[in-house]
Amino acid sequence: MKPKYTTKKQISAFCQSLGNDIFEDYPFDENWMAMRHMDKGGHVMAFCYEYYIGEVWVNVKCETDYREYWLKKYPEKIKPAYHMNKRHWLTMILDGSIANEDVETLLKTSYVLTKKGI
């Protein structure tokens, strides 16, 4: 069984597995990792950062039609995105509570939406 997503390293590895156009960037400081598209002018597909010591948060773009679904499914662990457009972005709090499949679905969706430039 695959370990739960709880680290920036795990998120980076998964994001980079989605396509060879994804790279890590640290636009603010070493805490804020941006996963960016090379071929889309550096558009961000996800921000990953420690918000509290030992607590990794990940901002992802989501389809607006599914926003409420995710907020209701994980009301304590998925929130309107920190420092982002709350209509289009969600924050996942990665403490092992969110199923791996759901973390991967949200990251894949963000990859597709940001690759298209939506």
Residue ranges and their predicted role:
Residues M1-I118:
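Charge-dense, helix-prone N-terminal extensions
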